[in-house]
Structure formats: structure tokens, C-alpha cells
């Protein structure tokens, strides 16, 4: 199982966007520069976040992006699904119906009405992961980071985003 780096980029950027002390919209270039990531790739990530309704774009000289909802209502699952889509992780091809010893013209109920047990287990596992990710929000992440980040670093981060001329 693997999520693209876009999920990581999105979560880090959205984390900075939860800081109410930054009094402006966030530009992609600033976010990419601050984190040392590709502006081009981050633009693609932000397009997905906007399309999913997590972000809105603010036009103009001081434009950029803002969250559309409060951090407590944006879950990790919302972000993952915005970047990766909502297709199930496991794709069952029902290969059990291709067994060489089966009469494909007369498959029993075991093969046609009973779900594949492997698929059932995989979908149950995915559902548990989704429930966990749904429980974790940007507000939770902000609180965790605030508890662990040195206060001086937090102030410097806010200053960096608020004062582009000081860079």
C-alpha cells in the first residue's frame, strides 16, 4: 500500500494554512519554497485540493489559497481522497471464476453469489483505515505540532509567511 508524495505535500501545506496568525492567503510558490518542494508538482496537488472543495483560490496581487472549512472539519481522509481519488485500494478481478477445473458455463452459487473472501478482508481493512483517517483532522494535527514544535520555530514560521520582504 502506498500513497503518493502528493498526500504528504498536501498535509504539510494545509497544516501551515491552519495557522490563524498568518493573516493572508497562501501562495503556492511560498509554500513550495518554504518546504523545498517543486512548485509545479505542488500546483497539481493544489488543483486537486481545490477541485475537492478543501481549498479556494483568492485572485489578485495578494491572492493565493485559503481553506474552505475550519481545520476541525477537514480530515486526513478528505485529503487522501482529494489527492488519490476514492477507488478502493484492492481491486478484485474474481480470478477464482477462472480456475481450470471449473465449468464456466455452470458456475455454482459459491462462485457467483458469494463474495470473494479475500476481497471481503481487504475491503474491511481499508474501511478500518478510512475510519482512522476520518478521525484525524487538520485541527488535531495543528495541536500535535504545536505541542512538539519549539515556540521560537513556530514564531519564525509565522514571520516567514507574513513578511515576504524579510526573506
Predicted regions: what is each one?
Residues 28-36:
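A short alpha-helical element within helix-turn-helix/winged-helix DNA-binding domains
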Residues 53-62, 66-68:
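Beta-hairpin "wing" of winged helix-turn-helix
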Residues 46-47:
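Short, hydrophobic-biased segments on the C-terminal half of alpha helices
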Residues 33, 50-51:
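Alpha-helical residues within the helix-turn-helix
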